[in-house]
Amino acid sequence: MPYSLEEQTYFMQEALKEAEKSLQKAEIPIGCVIVKDGEIIGRGHNAREESNQAIMHAEMMAINEANAHEGNWRLLDTTLFVTIEPCVMCSGAIGLARIPHVIYGASNQKFGGVDSLYQILTDERLNHRVQVERGLLAADCANIMQTFFRQGRERKKIAKHLIKEQSDPFD
């Protein structure tokens, strides 16, 4: 189902809310929602650190929730909104779930499986191709990632300072 720009913006803002959940837990802040007939049927945010599971990416969580909602592994007639270009693993899962439409915010230059490094969702050698739109609220999506990495650098500085204080009692 095609969505208006206003509707797309709303759904990407919902994905950003999911990303914020990850940011609050010091997880890489990526958020995702899956929409069918104008209704969010799956939500997810990165939870690898919290779960100690490498596959707990936002897209994987949203796909699992949408599968449960639909009672089907095929997510036909859905649109996946995600703040950052899906990685290779998530791109494969999107294809396997038969999601026909993906809209992402910012590109993923290090791990992108849609455009940046690989083109899994549009590869003609595969049996399922996905319509992809990119750049929706890209600045907002990139900004939350920049906030995460800035906070990480600040945490490292504080940790180094505390270690130095503990090791040098005469400072």
From Swiss-Prot:
Q: Where does Zn(2+) bind?
A: 57, 87, 90
User: Mind telling me which CDD domains this protein's record contains?
Assistant: nucleoside_deaminase
The chemistry this enzyme catalyses reads: adenosine(34) in tRNA + H2O + H(+) = inosine(34) in tRNA + NH4(+)
Q: Does the keyword Nucleotide-binding apply?
A: no
Q: What does this protein do?
A: Catalyzes the deamination of adenosine to inosine at the wobble position 34 of tRNA(Arg2).
User: What family classification does the UniProt entry report for this protein?
Assistant: Belongs to the cytidine and deoxycytidylate deaminase family.
Subunit note: Homodimer.
The protein's name: tRNA-specific adenosine deaminase
What is the name of the gene encoding this protein?
tadA
